[in-house]
């Protein structure tokens, strides 16, 4: 969604300030290529980070486990966890 909004905004700016249709096409093409290259670079950085984490002999196992936990999949279980925690208390 972010990329689509950015492309539409760039297209609007290009249409506003362009001298001809060819300028608009070239501007949009350049921005799309730039966005694609940025996304690929970010993905490559993420893959490099994961590789370093797995191959790092100094990394502790628990630290890696905690890093890999994502909050969003755990959200539905939070009320159950709280209820189970409060059940033992009186």
Swiss-Prot record:
In which tissues or organs does this protein occur?
A: Expressed in entodermal epithelium along the body column.
Q: Where in the cell is it found?
A: Secreted; Target cell membrane
| Primary location class | secreted
Q: Which residues form the signal peptide?
A: 1-20
Q: Which residues form the propeptide?
A: 21-59
Keyword Cytoplasm in the entry? The reply is no
Q: What keywords sit in the KW lines? A: Amidation, Antibiotic, Antimicrobial, Immunity, Innate immunity, Membrane, Secreted, Signal, Target cell membrane, Target membrane
Taken from the UniProt entry, a GO cellular component term is:
extracellular region
What positions are modified (Threonine amide)? 87
Keyword Repeat annotated: no
Family assignment from sequence similarity: Belongs to the arminin family.
Query: What's the stated role of this polypeptide?
Result: Antimicrobial peptide with a broad-spectrum antimicrobial activity. Keeps its antibacterial activity under a wide range of salt concentrations that mimic physiological conditions of human blood, which is surprising, since Hydra is an obligate freshwater animal with nearly no salt tolerance. Does not affect red blood cells.
Q: What protein name is recorded for this chain?
A: Arminin 45266
